[in-house]
Amino acid sequence: MHTSATPSHTNTPSSNLPESSASNTETAPTLGRFISFEGTEGVGKTTAIEQLCLRLEANGIPYLRTREPGGSPFAEQLRDILLDPATDIEDDTELLLLFAARCDHMQQVILPALQNGTWVICDRFTDSTIAYQGFGRAYGDELVRGKIDMLIKQFVTQLPELTLWLDLPVAEGMKRANKRSAADRFEQQATEFFTWVHTGFSQLASEYPERIQRIDASGSTDDVSARIWQTVMDRFDIK
């Protein structure tokens, strides 16, 4: 099965496709682990993922760093559409485009990597869809949540074993996010939208306390990185 991941020990921020530290010379004997990162805008996911990947590499653990929406060539094309501020689509269309991207990403990238013994580190996954589309767009509407859950059950064959929810007050996250470059289609939403998104993540953490671990995203990047690494070590028994 084709995968767009290119084995490498060096993360290239400008690349739109997954970055992998997996070796071409040896296949791991066991299935890889699947970790997702979640959170509202400006919580520091990108830096936290970079730090985790450095720790995995230092421990000789092969990993593939990827993202959603995106992660495969086709999914990246859909990402461009979804994040373009000029895109004007209905909520249902947005939801279906997200799952189209996710299906391709999973089949072309995530599953092959896991089957090869590579750890997959994904910037956003299904929880973001529930939080952003189910709560940010639909204010927690049960019918919309049911629709999303149905799509997950139908098309998502592998959920993360561990989800790291980086939690920060919405106002603080938005203050950080506003210092970045031009906002994309989601980042341009109002504070109320992200307050609902935060509510969604909080509810998901209550629903799935074993899988979703809340990480305090305040403080220095070193502090946050240490909290994340301790959680990963405890979950996967890394010495």
Report residues per predicted region.
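Pre-Walker A (Motif I) flank of P-loop NTPase domains
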Residues: T30-F34
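Hydrophobic anchor at the beta1->P-loop junction of P-loop NTPases
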Residues: F37
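Hydrophobic positions on the alpha1 helix immediately C-terminal to the Walker A/P-loop
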Residues: A48
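A glycine- and Lys/Arg-enriched "phosphate-lid" helix/loop adjacent to the NTP-binding pocket
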Residues: D127-T199
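Walker A (P-loop) phosphate-binding loop of P-loop NTPases
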Residues: G42
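NTP-dependent small-molecule kinase module
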Residues: H2-A28, Q51-C53, A171-K239
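Conserved lysine of the Walker
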Residues: K45
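ATP-dependent small-molecule kinase phosphotransfer cores
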Residues: N59-V156
